[in-house]
């Protein structure tokens, strides 16, 4: 009953089977009953008869307050959506020959992303003959990682991919 959507449930007069395995209000088994008798029991208790497992033989029906059940189900779904956190990866692009002022600006942007709880992909694109000096790019990435070590951990070390070197930083869990 945990992942039941409205389209899966048949209620009261929507049920089109001859007999059902009936479950009472408190979850007790009431046995196999003809549909008319099961609906009469539900009507006497002023609640709904809900078909919860139509594929079973015989189908399983439960006596419950459907409005309350639906409300509780929606409430649980809402809570689960609240608990989900969407982790986005923001990218900061650098150059191997980046100037100090530009580096500070990119660093400030990267820190903002990390403080908001986002992961940051720091990438360096090598153009032309710069690719022969990969150590310069590695130093720039190391400087970036060192400058953010108080709020971030290195999730993926510096790595080459074609003409691009990148690393990924994640915020320290308790600093979110």
UniProtKB/Swiss-Prot annotation:
Q: What does this gene product do?
A: IF-3 binds to the 30S ribosomal subunit and shifts the equilibrium between 70S ribosomes and their 50S and 30S subunits in favor of the free subunits, thus enhancing the availability of 30S subunits on which protein synthesis initiation begins.
UniProt xrefs under HAMAP family: IF_3 (MF_00080)
User: Recorded GO terms, molecular function?
Assistant: ribosome binding; translation initiation factor activity
Instruction: Write down the superkingdom of origin.
Output: Bacteria
Quaternary context: Monomer.
What InterPro entries does the entry give? T_IF-3_C_sf (IPR036788), T_IF-3_N_sf (IPR036787), Translation_initiation_fac3_CS (IPR019813), Translation_initiation_fac_3 (IPR001288), Translation_initiation_fac_3_C (IPR019815), Translation_initiation_fac_3_N (IPR019814)
Q: Which GO terms describe its cellular component?
A: cytosol; membrane
Subcellular localization, as worded in the UniProt entry: Cytoplasm
Identify the main location. cytoplasm
Q: Which GO terms describe its biological process?
A: ribosome disassembly
The name this protein carries in UniProt is: Translation initiation factor IF-3
Keyword annotations from UniProtKB, A to Z: Cytoplasm, Initiation factor, Protein biosynthesis
Q: Which NCBIfam families match?
A: infC
Species assigned in the record: Streptococcus mutans serotype c (strain ATCC 700610 / UA159)
What the entry lists under PROSITE patterns is as follows: IF3
| Similarity remark | Belongs to the IF-3 family.
